[in-house]
Regions:
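Active-site nucleophilic cysteine motif
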Residues: 83-102
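Generic recognition of cysteine residues
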Residues: 76, 88-91, 125, 130
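Intrinsically disordered, low-complexity
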Residues: 2-75, 150, 154-175
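Secondary-structure boundary/capping residues
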Residues: 75-76, 104
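...with weaker cross-activation on analogous glycine-rich loops/strands in unrelated enzymes
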Residues: 63, 96-175
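Short linear capping/connector segments at secondary-structure termini
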Residues: 44-48, 77-83, 113-115
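Short, polar loop/linker segments at the starts of domains and inter-domain junctions
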Residues: 77-89, 156-159
Length: 175
């Protein structure tokens, strides 16, 4: 008799969870809760990043800003630090431009300062990789960088590079 009681209780608990899950799915149209689970990935099309449909506004804005300078500007040391709109950008100037577009920084930052920007570790949507000599960002699964991309100057790549030797940083607020 004790065994049957335990089985009945377990089935009742399982039924409650099933009803709760079905109700939650119906309330959201069958989609997952925003912010739950893995984030979408941007697509690369003709040298520009296309944001995923589930990307937060700050991420979309950062991608759009990066697209403004991707492969349309040359690389130059110090580029993008004197003013936001520049003829050329260096690595940290390009990353800063994208972060500024997403309203995550107010002023351009050199790579050494990006090592200390935001919070430690990888972000859900944007991770900045920085050391004293170089910086790049991974935004919605695509790498925005001034090296190891097609062409010259800032650009996107779906090929990742090693993060070894870089500090990993992310925006310190929920995007």
């Amino acid at each position: 008799m004790l065994f049957r009681t335990r089985i009945s209780l377990a089935l009742a608990v399982a039924a409650v969870f099933a009803v709760t899950a079905a109700s939650a799915s119906a309330e959201t149209g069958g989609t997952s809760t925003p912010g739950a689970g893995p984030t979408g990935e941007a697509k690369l099309q003709d040298g520009e990043a296309i944001p995923p449909s589930d990307a937060p506004t700050r991420v979309i804005n950062a991608i759009e800003a990066a697209n403004e300078i991707a492969k349309g500007h040359d690389y130059c040391m110090g580029g993008g630090h004197a003013r936001w709109k520049s003829q050329c950008y260096d690595c940290s100037g390009a990353v800063s431009f994208a972060l500024h577009g997403g309203r995550m920084i107010d002023d351009p930052m050199p790579s050494g300062s990006l090592e200390k920007w935001g919070e430690k570790g990888k972000g859900d949507w944007i991770t900045v990789y920085a050391n004293s000599g170089h910086a790049f960002a991974v935004i919605a699964g695509l790498r925005f960088d001034t090296s190891m991309t097609d062409g010259k100057g800032p650009g996107w790549s779906d090929e990742m590079r090693s993060g070894r030797g870089y500090k990993k940083r992310h925006f310190n607020d929920k995007i």
